[in-house]
């Protein structure tokens, strides 16, 4: 069959960074005969996946959203974090028309301003500096009831690191003489993205009704009580913060609610719980008719509320360019990273392009992935191998979540198991690509599993790293690797391997030169 396509496959091993030291390195210490041989024998290079190279502030660790946007765009895409930092530094944030109107509306009607978000310096889903700027904006414009609902991190930050953030905000409210921290809860509940509505319900009830399993006089006391119960930041149970004599901070009709997370994937569920009239994830005991609900950035095109910083659109991303040249493509991953190989890889476009198929494999329903480090990789690999051999696709883009999702648990032995599982999967993918006479690129979006303990604190290292990631070529062309690349060079590399023109919007450079 002359129409059988020889696919170019991009396999993204999420959280699979490159680090030379063996100590606490789940990737180097795992038994990975397949990846070892590929690294020794195939054209390969290391590429940058963090900081300025991906449009983040200098030194900022990479993350999956940012990684996939850069992978698909073929140019450095300045991230919301960098954009917001700049807005605050230059003062434009404080005159943002959407934010100022929402605060002014609450002031005029004598209603409360509620600010919620991940109170963290992690910079992945939010940044506490942005939340601080929002508190200052509200106070400057005359809001008298400012309530901060703090989601705690411990995933993109050390597992027990929230105290300094809570102290910082407590001091700020004392200085303003107005406002307070009204609730604390771990992101495990407030920021679920896998339709575990029982978790989200606990967060929703805490926020709307000031109803939680625990109560404390102040946020630090609430946190310390959670630690005493054995809960790390990420898992802090819903805690109402209310000293004797303080008004309760339940959300009421006409109040303003501003959600300060800038990353979409873990902000969508709880936002829909607040704003969707037809919401059916659970029975909401209280539905609040807000004066204003503001999302900091656009969490999804179908969430119809005001947005302070709408997305800047990207043209001629890799997926769009393939469509314009009548190429077929497949995107495939598990639930945990499905949005990354579709929405984020397509530059924030939700709808598939013409000629783009998608396969979603359900991630296992376990509390944390150290309990099942292989996740759904067997089914994912089976579907991927079948697609490679189908002759249907010019390009296949796949993400294996294991290195990242298991790396986030901080469980070293589980991370080793995850990496060994991936090696077995890669063996099958390589064989399928060779059988189809195709080409394969293996890379990662950022590091994680190569650093499982924080040498400074001795705590488990659950966050991403700023280390480079591998890029390996397997295929039917003789190629030479170029040094000094970054994630945004991958799309131009793929087009060049397919002997296609590279659009002028893509400023990245090919990293494998055909000899």
Curated annotation (Swiss-Prot):
Region forming the signal peptide: none
Gene Ontology CC annotation, any one: cytosol
Top-level class of the enzyme under EC nomenclature: isomerase
Active site: 64
Pathway(s) annotated for this protein in UniProt: Carbohydrate degradation; glycolysis; pyruvate from D-glyceraldehyde 3-phosphate: step 3/5
Keyword presence, Aminoacyl-tRNA synthetase: no
Domain of life, source organism: Bacteria
Note describing how the cofactor binds: Binds 2 manganese ions per subunit.
InterPro entries reported for this sequence: Alkaline_phosphatase_core_sf, BPG-indep_PGM_N, Metalloenzyme, PGAM_B_sf, Pgm_bpd_ind
Entry binding sites for substrate: 125, 155-156, 187, 193, 263-266, 337
GO BP terms, alphabetized: glucose catabolic process; glycolytic process
EC number assigned by the record: 5.4.2.12
Keyword ATP-binding: no
Reaction(s) this enzyme catalyzes, per UniProt: (2R)-2-phosphoglycerate = (2R)-3-phosphoglycerate
Alphabetical UniProt keywords: Glycolysis, Isomerase, Manganese, Metal-binding
Positions annotated to bind Mn(2+) 2: 14, 64, 445-446
CC cofactor: Mn(2+)
Molecular-function annotations in GO: manganese ion binding; phosphoglycerate mutase activity
Binding annotation for Mn(2+) 1: 404, 408, 464
Subunit details: Monomer.
Known function: Catalyzes the interconversion of 2-phosphoglycerate and 3-phosphoglycerate.
Family (UniProt): Belongs to the BPG-independent phosphoglycerate mutase family.
Name of the protein described by the UniProt record: 2,3-bisphosphoglycerate-independent phosphoglycerate mutase
Species assigned in the record: Yersinia pseudotuberculosis serotype I (strain IP32953)
